[in-house]
Amino acid sequence: DGSVQLFRPDMNIARMKNTCERMCMPEVPGDLFMAGLKAVIEADKDWVPSGKNTSLYIRPFMFGDEVSFSVLPAKHYKFMIILSPTGSYYAANDAGLTTARIYVQDTYIRAARGGTGYAKVGGNYGGGMRASQDAMRYNCKDVLWLDAAEHKYVEEIGTSNAFFVIGDEVITAPLDSGTI
């Protein structure tokens, strides 16, 4: 019907809260987050794509805003939300299926228990750059990350959860492990 819908904003607000807690940043109140989200989408509604397999990518983020080189939590922060129209991450093949070659990474790690893997922080992306470049060399679209301890248990794909269907059962990495 042409209306703009938000997908699980409550879960995104909760993830931001968890990230802020982990990074010693002040929590963004849920009502402020939602009001900001609605305001920026309303202001930029002409950027919302309407084509098949398109969406508006929404990236909320926060950073310390002060002059300091210390490795301490900041006293002042800025919370921002940026938007970008986007298409399908993976292109459909001739049969109309969306598939992708995935590179299994067994050397580097993206996250370890006790780390920041569950939080939305830039370092998680930075740590994956080498593996992403390796994947591209093999004509792969993304990286399948294995566990940090033994490099044999599936954790996640860089851009999404990984799951397997065996019979009637859906198997995925534990969501409470602290790494995804």
Regions found by a protein language model. Name each.
Residues 25, 46-50:
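Secondary-structure boundary/capping residues
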